[in-house]
Design a protein with these regions (language model features):
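Conserved AMP-binding/adenylate-forming
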Residues: 30, 47-103, 240, 315-439, 444-448, 455, 461-462
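Conserved pre-ATP/AMP-binding loop-to-beta segment of ANL
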Residues: 167-186, 192-193, 198, 228-238
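Conserved AMP-binding/adenylation subdomain of ANL enzymes
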Residues: 206-288, 303
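Conserved AMP-binding A3 loop
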Residues: 33-35, 182-218
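AMP-binding/adenylate-forming catalytic core of the ANL superfamily
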Residues: 74, 120-122, 282, 289, ...
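Adenylate-forming
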Residues: 77, 122-132, 150, 242, ...
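Structural core segment of the AMP-binding/adenylate-forming
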Residues: 91-166, 176
Length: 556
């Protein structure tokens, strides 16, 4: 590993000094240069610093699961303010906290309390919900409200975000920025309560924010090299579709900035609107676009096929966090034959781990080339699997990995075990290490289904169901069964104007999977519920499956 360690605030400062006039963010009528972003993030940092926020205890005085910095919650839709919020927090030696803007009051209260947030930056649209729970959040003493088109007035005691920035100089606070400063990302809470994953900034920079050369994996060795890569790199324009409140989107955005490229945000930032996405792509000639599986790519492709848009600039579609089936990839690449699809694998607890490229005529899903430190541990977490080992194990990552979960030493010890002197991150994904050295990702153990003593990975079933031409989207969950313990249930959304019977769907899946993996229950819905980033909502699917059984007189 490199001996030079990095701080994200300082990497941004160094790049911005060299690229002050280059555009960094484009959203609606806003066109911010790297210099503009530096000015605004410095002002936010100064405002936070003058308000008394920053570092309380240095890393050397803390346990791995502890934070010694003040936390700033970002309760925002995509926009320039989100990245300003992250950078401003880092430059004040605070820690940004990602807040899911779909949360209801109880979920929002839990996250803001659990994260120990001391300040919050939020869009005006969210002011009424915050007002409901504000009395339960006495630790939050600074409320910065970002104006939007909702017409909601300032909360009592809140400060308008733009007025706050205008009230202070654009100075970088002299606070002793350190590679030990924290980056924190809250997990989605898809299968349990959200948890704050703590990373050293140097480690997340190396793991997932552009500190290494993709494919080659060589780490940068100096700030001068970081600047040189940004000045002389590929540049380009990346269209950001997933919400920046999710880790993968944040990592993509920071990789982009560390390449000196431009981040493009669709005009419609509250939902995925295919027309808004493609209008932005055409207008700014975006070269890269990020998506999250079939749920995002299918409606985009349908809109592309109206042939209203010039898509000739698009060369790479980056996919992560959800499955894009081989069938849909082939359809996309038939329509866009000069485009590549890059699947990435990783988790909040591991950073970026591997990738796979699909091109016209050669598509696959679920297998990835492995990066340094990516291994498979046996089921007892005692030894490593060799390539070609038939049994699945735990996908694990060594090297640059997180410190732990905020204020949870027990969970931290389970997820980040030390084996033969090496520390690993083991977030719960099952995988096989193939003879070729590729990784075959099977799925998240926490949402697997045990039916009749056999383990079924829902992602494998979802992939098979989604390959049916009538299926637009699918989520698979388990529900109690008197005989088998649990049975596999598929919640299905059809393509508009298409349909299939349960028997037809089961027969289709049975061609690809063993009988015990074929769904025994089917629930047809108008729309699959997903997170804003496109991730499956397994709690919703499980509840729906159980309700369907009750309505039918009980499962089994």
């Amino acid at each position: 590993m490199t001996t030079q360690e990095f701080n994200i605030a300082l990497t941004h400062e160094a790049i911005s000094e060299a690229l002050a006039d280059r555009e960094a963010i484009v959203w609606r009528d806003r066109r911010l240069t790297y210099g503009d972003l530096t000015d605004r993030s410095r002002r936010l940092a100064t405002y936070l610093h003058r308000a008394g926020f920053g570092v309380r205890r240095e890393r050397a005085d803390l346990a791995p699961h502890e934070s010694g910095q003040d936390h700033v919650a970002l309760y925002l839709y995509n926009g320039n303010e989100y990245l300003e919020g992250m950078l401003g927090a880092f430059k004040a030696r605070c820690v940004s906290v990602n807040v899911n803007y779909r949360y209801v009051a109880d979920e929002l209260r839990y996250l803001l309390q659990n994260s120990e947030s001391k300040a919050i930056i939020y869009h005006s649209k969210f002011a009424p919900l915050l007002a409901e729970i504000r009395d339960d959040l006495p630790e939050i003493t600074l409320w910065l409200q970002v104006a939007d088109d909702s017409g909601e007035p300032l909360l009592p005691g809140a400060v308008d975000y733009e007025e706050a920035l205008a009230s202070v100089p654009a100075d970088l606070p002299d606070v002793g920025h350190s590679p030990d400063d924290l980056y924190m990302i809250y997990t989605g809470g898809t299968t349990g309560m959200p948890k704050g994953v703590l990373w050293r900034q140097h480690d997340i920079f190396m793991s997932a924010m552009g500190g290494r050369t993709p494919g080659v994996w060589d780490p940068v060795t100096s700030y001068d090299e970081v600047v040189d890569r940004a000045v002389n790199g590929m540049g380009g324009v990346m269209l950001m579709i997933p919400p920046l409140m999710h880790g993968a989107a944040q990592w993509s955005a920071f990789i982009l900035m560390h390449q000196g490229a431009k981040l493009l945000i669709p005009d419609e930032n509250r939902r995925m609107d295919p027309a808004s996405v493609l209008r932005a792509l055409e207008r700014e000639k975006a070269s890269t676009m990020t998506v999250t599986g079939n749920a995002v790519m299918r409606p985009l492709l349908d809109e592309m096929k109206t042939e209203k848009y010039d898509l000739s600039s698009l060369t790479i579609i980056g996919n992560g966090s959800a499955i894009m089936t081989e069938e849909l990839k082939a359809e996309v690449l038939d329509f866009l034959p000069n485009t590549l699809i890059n699947d990435s694998v990783g988790a909040s607890e591991t950073g970026a781990q591997g990738s796979h490229l699909s091109v016209k005529g050669a598509t696959s899903t679920g297998r990835f080339g492995t990066g340094p430190g990516l291994v498979v541990l046996d089921v007892f977490m005692e030894k490593l699997h060799e390539p070609g080992h038939e049994e699945p194990g735990w996908m694990a990552q060594s090297g640059w990995v997180p410190l732990g979960y905020l204020n949870d030493p027990e969970k931290s010890a389970r997820t980040f075990p030390v084996i033969d002197g090496q520390r690993y991150a083991v977030p719960g994904d099952r995988a096989r290490l193939l003879e070729s050295g590729e990784m075959e990702l099977l799925g998240r153990d926490s949402v697997s289904i045990n039916t009749g003593g056999e383990k079924v990975f829902v992602e494998e079933v979802e992939k098979a169901v989604a390959s049916h031409p009538a299926v637009r989207d699918v989520t698979v969950a388990g529900r109690p069964h008197e005989r088998w313990g649990n049975e596999v249930v598929a919640v299905v959304e059809f393509v508009e104007g298409a349909s299939a019977t349960e028997a037809e769907l089961a027969a289709h899946v049975g061609k690809a999977l063993a009988p015990y993996k074929v769904p025994k229950g089917w629930v047809m819905v108008d729309r699959i519920q997903r997170s804003p980033s496109g991730k499956a909502d397994y709690r919703w699917a499980k509840k729906l499956a159980a309700e369907a059984a009750e309505a039918a007189g009980g499962a089994g």
